């Protein structure tokens, strides 16, 4: 049994990675979430900070919030790993990446700097099969972001099911959304009662820059 910290997005892939680690007898010492200091939302997935805290409480796993403005993202991440190693006795940081080599290299480099292992439970497995494993394991997740150049806004708010995955594939998008076509928020699961996402939501949108390309993402604003 080894203690680990989970680099957590509140989405399906990181949740499945967390689930696999727990099933193997490992102990999650904390959830590590990077937060945009200026917006009080998680980087990349845009989950409000107050909701992240509710997820941590629901999972009964301590939370490590890494506040960064972006230019210090790398150093802050490594610093958080070092602190977790020293204070919590973790052996590794777990990531939900599947096959994006650049992500793996970055994560591995940060873990090497911190003197811990980088663990990728889903690495190079079939994307579509991973989605079905997630669904068949009893987890429930809602689509909270879509890239409009790939998918229509009618997918927003849909619970990810086998039928919805089929619809996603028919748009030409990756079944797992690994290319950024969509992001999810997990609200229920087999090993824990997650926070109910539907308590007071409203639509919102913002324009963000990804790799210097302007994209419009529609999302759910989730509040309590």
Give residue spans per PLM region.
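Nucleotide-activated chemistry modules centered on ATP-dependent adenylation/adenylyltransferase
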Residues: 1-224
């Amino acid at each position: 049994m080894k203690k680990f910290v989970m680099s957590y997005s509140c989405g399906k892939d990181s949740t499945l990675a967390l689930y696999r680690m727990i099933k193997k007898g490992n102990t999650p010492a904390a959830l590590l979430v990077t937060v945009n200091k200026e917006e009080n939302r998680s980087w990349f997935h845009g989950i409000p900070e107050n909701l992240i805290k509710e997820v941590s409480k629901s999972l009964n796993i301590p939370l490590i919030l890494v506040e960064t403005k972006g230019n210090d993202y790398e150093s802050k991440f490594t610093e958080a790993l070092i602190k977790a190693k020293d204070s919590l006795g973790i052996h590794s940081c777990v990531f939900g990446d599947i096959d994006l080599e650049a992500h793996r290299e970055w994560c591995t480099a940060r873990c090497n700097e911190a003197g811990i292992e980088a663990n990728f439970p889903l690495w190079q497995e079939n994307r579509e099969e991973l989605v079905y494993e997630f669904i068949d394991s009893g987890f429930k997740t809602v689509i909270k972001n879509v890239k409009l150049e790939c998918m229509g806004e009618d997918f927003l708010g849909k619970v990810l099911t086998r039928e919805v995955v089929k619809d996603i594939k028919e748009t030409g998008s990756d079944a797992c959304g690994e290319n950024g076509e969509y992001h999810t928020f997990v609200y229920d699961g087999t090993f824990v009662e997650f926070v109910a996402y539907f308590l007071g939501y409203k639509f919102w949108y913002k324009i963000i820059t990804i790799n210097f390309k302007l994209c419009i993402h529609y999302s759910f604003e989730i509040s309590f």
